[in-house]
């Protein structure tokens, strides 16, 4: 075993957003943080070794992603997602969220519409609004805890009508989906993609959680389905979630369409770089030598997921959970507690002493829900679940 995922590592005092910004975010310091989507264990030893070696060189001048890194990414994507890409399609950046903002800025004008599918990762909304575009919600359908695209409503949104001042130019896809944990099937993606193609809507596909899939589920990049979707999609990826290196600010965008790629790069190059020295070193080490560590992490996370779902459904009345197909996030249905959203947030903070992401942060369909991060040692997870059980049951 490369590392002991069950070992607690103290993160307080490390300038961790998750652990050191509790007062600023929740108004209370003494909470168990299970919110921000990073992991509470060290990254792969191969990454740490590579960073130390680069640090020992002592000179940290301007840098660039070399051809070897591009080839390593091409091989990773082929092996893990069965997608043949060319290294020329890869555009490096310093994060998925900045890259999404640049894409919205590049491919919309003020007043254009961008479709998102809530409840969904909240920076999608700000990426649209910050760049002068208008958010259009195509809310996911929830059937007994399993979420699906509402394609009928999507068609209605895109239907031309005299009342519409503008039409949608982009759809931001979350795949796998944060926070509901869906790993979209090929057929679902193909139907969604077909509608976008028919209506000249480009797809921005955030696939940062692509490596977190469990059991029989398989991640399929929507751009890999056919040539038309490849030409119509920008795919956003990074090793940051997979290898717990979000603070190193390195990501990439796969853009097959040369015209779109050039337009994106014109805006990007004036705003952000290609990632810092240590981020690029970490990315190379991760995709070249991190396979064993990742496999062990996925096994541990899968057990965490099963443990949490069973514990909640058997021990915590008023809260239900469905095992996520992907991501290390669990979407808790708290509607059975019969609390308003403000009451629920107060209850989680002040009674359960937990820091979770309130469902309302994720937009429409988030009312009555909480998102819990399970990427932590089992002891931390058990403590969080026990806190929740005691609070709900009124145990002392």
Give the predicted meaning of each segment.
Residues 1-18, 27-30:
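Conserved PLP-binding active-site segment in aminotransferase class I/II-type PLP enzymes
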Residues 3, 26-32, 37-52, 85-86, ...:
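PLP-dependent class I/II
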Residues 8, 17, 60-62, 222, ...:
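Short clusters of hydrophobic/aromatic residues that line enzyme substrate/ligand-binding pockets
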Residues 54, 61-94:
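Conserved N-terminal alpha-helix of the aminotransferase class I/II PLP-enzyme fold
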Residues 56-59, 106:
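Short acidic, glycine/Ser/Thr-rich loop/turn "cap" segments at secondary-structure junctions
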């Amino acid at each position: 075993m490369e590392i002991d995922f069950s070992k607690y590592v103290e993160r307080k005092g490390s300038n961790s957003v998750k652990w050191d910004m509790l007062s600023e975010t929740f108004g209370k310091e003494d909470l168990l943080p299970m919110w921000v989507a990073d992991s509470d264990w060290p990254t792969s030893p191969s990454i740490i070794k590579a960073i130390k070696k680069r640090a020992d060189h002592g000179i940290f001048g301007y840098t660039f992603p070399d051809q070897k890194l591009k080839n390593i990414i091409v091989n990773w994507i082929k092996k893990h997602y069965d997608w043949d890409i060319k290294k020329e399609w890869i555009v490096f950046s310093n994060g998925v969220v900045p890259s999404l903002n640049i894409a919205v800025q590049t491919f919309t004008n003020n007043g254009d519409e961008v479709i998102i599918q809530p409840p969904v990762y909240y920076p999608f909304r700000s990426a649209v609004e910050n760049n002068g575009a208008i958010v259009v919600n195509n809310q996911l359908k929830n059937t007994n805890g399993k979420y699906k695209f509402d394609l009928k409503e999507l068609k209605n949104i895109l239907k031309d009508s005299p009342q519409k001042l503008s039409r949608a130019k982009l759809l931001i896809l979350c795949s796998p989906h944060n926070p509901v944990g869906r790993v979209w099937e090929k057929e679902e993606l193909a139907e969604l993609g077909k509608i976008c193609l028919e209506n000249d809507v480009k797809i921005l596909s955030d696939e940062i959680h692509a490596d977190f899939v469990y059991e029989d589920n398989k991640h399929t990049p929507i751009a890999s389905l056919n040539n038309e979707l490849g030409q119509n999609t920008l795919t956003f990826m990074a090793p940051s979630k997979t290898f717990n290196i979000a603070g190193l600010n390195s990501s990439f965008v796969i853009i097959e369409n040369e015209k779109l790629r050039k337009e994106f790069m014109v805006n990007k190059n004036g705003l952000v770089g290609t990632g810092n020295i240590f981020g690029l070193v970490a990315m190379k080490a991760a995709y070249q030598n991190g396979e064993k560590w990742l496999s062990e992490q996925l096994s541990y996370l899968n057990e965490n997921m099963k443990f949490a779902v069973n514990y909640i459904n058997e021990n915590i009345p008023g809260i239900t959970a469905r095992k996520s197909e992907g991501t290390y996030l669990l979407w808790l249905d708290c509607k059975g507690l019969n609390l308003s959203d403000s009451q629920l947030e107060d209850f989680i903070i002040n009674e359960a002493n937990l820091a979770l992401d309130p469902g309302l942060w994720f937009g429409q369909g988030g009312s009555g829900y909480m998102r819990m991060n399970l990427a932590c040692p089992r002891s931390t997870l058990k403590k969080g679940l026990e806190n929740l059980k005691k609070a709900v049951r009124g145990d002392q």
